[in-house]
C-alpha cells in the first residue's frame, strides 16, 4: 500500500480491511464490505459487485440510494444556506416542523425539537420526562425489557438490554425496565412515574411487536396516573410500518414521539415531537443542539417526507408486506419459522440459530440483510421497492437459505 495513509483506501478487499482495522474505532467489529456507490435499492462494492439492499442503512434510506429528490434537496440547499445555529430560524426548519406535526396529528399545540439522530431525540425525551416530574416525586421512568433507545448514556439507560449497559455502569438513575404486558405495567405504575417509553416494534430485539392492545392500555394507564406516554418511532416512523407512525395502528394519541432514521432518507436528523400539554414542558435554556434543525438537514428531511407522501410509499409498505409474507412462506424452507413485524420492517424467524450464516450466505449471493439476533433475519428495505425487487429478494434469500441448509446437512445438523 501507499505509505501515505492520508490517501483514500484502495478498493481491494485485503487493503480496505487493513485500513478499516487500523483507522476506524473497533466498536463495530469487522466491516462486512466496502460499498462505493448506490442507486435505488442497489449498492455496489469496490469490486463492482452489485447487491440488492434490503437493509437500507437499518431502515434509514427510505427512498433508496441517490434518489433524485434527495440529491436535489441536498444540492440546492447546500448552495443556498446550510447552517446558522438555533439562535435563528430558517424556512426549511419551519416547513419540516409543520409537516411532522401534520403527519403525526399533533394539532396546533404540537412542537418539534430537532437533533441529529435517534439517540439525541431519545435524550430529549428523557429530559421531557424529567421536566414533567420537576419539583415533584415523579422521578421514575419505565421502559420495556428488550427495548433499544440508543447508545448515548441517557438513551442507554432507557434501553432494556443489560448486556449493552454492563461496561458503562452506573446508569442514569430512575429508569426501570418492565415486561411488555399490561399486567406488568399496572403493577409498576404509580404516582411517582413520570413517563413510560415504548417502541411499537422492538427492532433490535428481533422485530418483536407489542402485544395486541398494549398501546391502547398503556395510554389509558399512563393518563390515569398522570404519566407521559412517549413512543420511540425511530425505527418504525416515516411510513415504514404501513402507517406514518407505528402508534397510529393503535389509534391512540401519545404525549410525545421520537423520530429519526427514515425521516432524513440517509441524512442524519432526528426529532422529538410533542403533543398537547407536553409541548409546554421545555422552556428557554432547558435543552439545545448546535447542529439540530440545521437548514441543510431539514431541507432534505422535508423533501424526503414530501416524496414519501406524494409517491404513496406508506401504502406501498403495506402492500409489499403482504407480498413478502406470502413469498417467504412459499419458499418452503425448513429454516423459516415465521415472519414478525409490520410493513417493511419484518423479522424472519429461523428454526435454528444460524442468522449470521444466513446473512453471510445472502451477501455472497448479492443480498444485504441483517441478523437482529441469533435466530432472526431483519429486513428493512427502501419504501420504494416494487414487484421486481420483491421477486429478486425472494430468489436471493431462497438461495441463501438453501446454502445454509446444505451446510447444516453436511455437518449432520437438522436443516
Predicted features, each with a name:
Residues 2-415:
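Conserved N-terminal phosphate-binding loop of PLP-dependent enzymes in the Aspartate aminotransferase
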Amino acid at each position: 500500500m501507499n505509505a501515505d495513509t492520508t490517501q483514500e483506501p484502495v478498493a481491494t478487499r485485503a487493503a480496505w480491511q487493513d485500513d478499516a482495522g487500523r483507522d476506524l474505532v473497533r466498536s463495530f467489529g469487522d466491516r462486512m464490505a466496502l460499498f462505493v456507490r448506490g442507486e435505488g435499492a442497489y449498492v455496489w462494492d469496490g469490486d463492482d459487485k452489485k447487491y440488492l439492499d434490503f437493509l437500507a442503512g437499518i431502515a434509514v434510506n427510505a427512498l433508496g440510494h441517490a434518489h433524485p429528490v434527495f440529491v436535489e434537496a441536498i444540492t440546492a440547499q447546500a448552495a443556498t444556506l446550510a447552517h446558522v445555529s438555533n439562535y435563528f430560524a430558517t424556512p426549511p426548519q419551519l416547513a419540516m416542523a409543520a409537516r411532522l406535526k401534520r403527519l403525526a396529528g399533533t394539532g396546533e399545540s404540537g412542537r418539534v425539537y430537532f437533533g441529529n439522530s435517534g439517540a439525541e431525540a431519545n435524550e430529549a425525551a428523557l429530559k421531557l420526562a424529567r421536566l414533567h416530574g420537576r419539583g415533584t416525586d415523579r422521578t421514575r421512568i419505565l421502559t420495556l425489557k428488550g427495548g433499544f433507545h440508543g447508545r448515548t448514556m441517557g438513551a442507554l439507560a432507557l434501553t432494556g438490554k443489560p448486556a449493552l449497559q454492563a461496561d458503562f455502569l452506573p446508569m442514569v438513575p430512575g429508569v426501570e425496565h418492565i415486561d411488555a404486558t399490561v399486567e406488568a405495567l399496572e403493577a409498576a405504575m404509580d404516582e411517582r412515574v413520570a413517563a413510560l417509553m415504548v417502541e411499537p416494534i422492538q427492532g433490535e430485539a428481533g422485530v418483536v411487536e407489542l402485544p395486541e392492545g398494549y398501546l391502547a392500555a398503556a395510554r389509558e394507564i399512563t393518563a390515569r396516573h398522570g404519566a407521559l406516554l412517549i413512543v420511540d418511532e425511530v425505527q418504525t416512523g416515516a411510513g415504514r410500518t404501513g402507517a406514518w407512525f407505528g402508534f397510529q395502528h393503535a389509534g391512540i394519541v401519545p404525549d410525545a414521539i421520537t423520530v429519526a432514521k427514515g425521516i432524513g432518507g440517509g441524512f442524519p436528523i432526528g426529532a422529538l415531537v410533542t403533543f398537547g400539554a407536553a409541548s409546554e414542558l421545555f422552556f428557554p435554556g432547558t435543552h439545545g443542539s448546535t447542529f439540530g434543525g440545521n437548514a441543510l438537514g431539514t431541507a432534505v428531511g422535508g423533501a424526503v417526507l414530501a416524496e414519501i407522501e406524494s409517491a404513496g410509499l406508506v401504502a406501498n409498505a403495506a402492500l409489499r408486506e403482504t407480498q413478502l409474507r406470502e413469498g417467504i412462506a412459499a419458499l418452503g424452507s425448513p429454516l423459516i419459522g415465521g415472519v414478525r413485524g409490520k410493513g417493511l420492517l419484518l423479522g424472519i424467524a429461523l428454526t435454528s440459530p444460524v442468522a449470521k450464516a444466513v446473512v453471510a450466505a445472502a451477501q455472497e449471493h448479492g443480498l444485504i440483510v441483517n441478523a437482529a439476533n441469533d435466530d432472526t433475519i431483519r429486513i428493512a428495505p427502501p419504501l420504494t421497492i416494487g414487484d421486481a425487487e420483491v421477486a429478486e429478494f425472494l430468489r436471493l434469500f431462497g438461495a441463501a437459505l438453501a446454502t445454509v441448509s446444505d451446510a447444516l446437512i453436511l455437518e449432520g445438523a437438522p436443516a
